[in-house]
Amino acid sequence: MPRSDNLYEIPNNVPVPVADGACNHLTGMRLPSVALRSTSGRLVDLAGLSGRVVIYCYPRTGRPDVDPPQGWNEIPGARGCTPQACAFRDHHQELQELGAQVFGLSAQDTDYQREAVARLHLPFELLSDSELELANRLRLPIFEIGGMRLIKRLTLIARGGQIEKVFYPVFPPDKNANVMSYLLCRPPDVLRRSRQRNDQYLKGNEWP
């Protein structure tokens, strides 16, 4: 039976999450070493990844045949996980060109996440923190509904296992312009050196 609303759209009247300071402690922290199961079938330890990593945390993706939990749309920041995933999908190539790996992370189990990856054609892996081990060690903001404990929506940018930027709260959920702008202003070293060489070349070959 199809759900009674459009999973792929964000209603106009959803409440806006407030900046409550719940993530103020994260910038500069080291990611803890936690083996997270991926939708690709492997274990991923975010702390051990080199380079820049974008980790977008989300409460839970819905399904087209199941209505959301009662009261879901009334929770600030809860609605919009599917549009958020699609936005990262649509900008994935650009993020890769900026030197970033992308992962989605939620408290849902891997089988549930795999359905979303297949249905939404996501080109990146989703990671399951079903025991909230990573969330608890980082003291990420959590909320409860229908017997579920879920991670609030936020985005972490890490480099070499250390958190360098936090976006929280994230609203609207499908707008990742802040992430793109941040990465564009801080290109990876290889792109930075290339730009510097281009600038030097142009200075040495100016029109008379």
Give the ranges of each region predicted by the language model.
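Chalcogenol-based redox active-site neighborhoods
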Residues: M1-P208
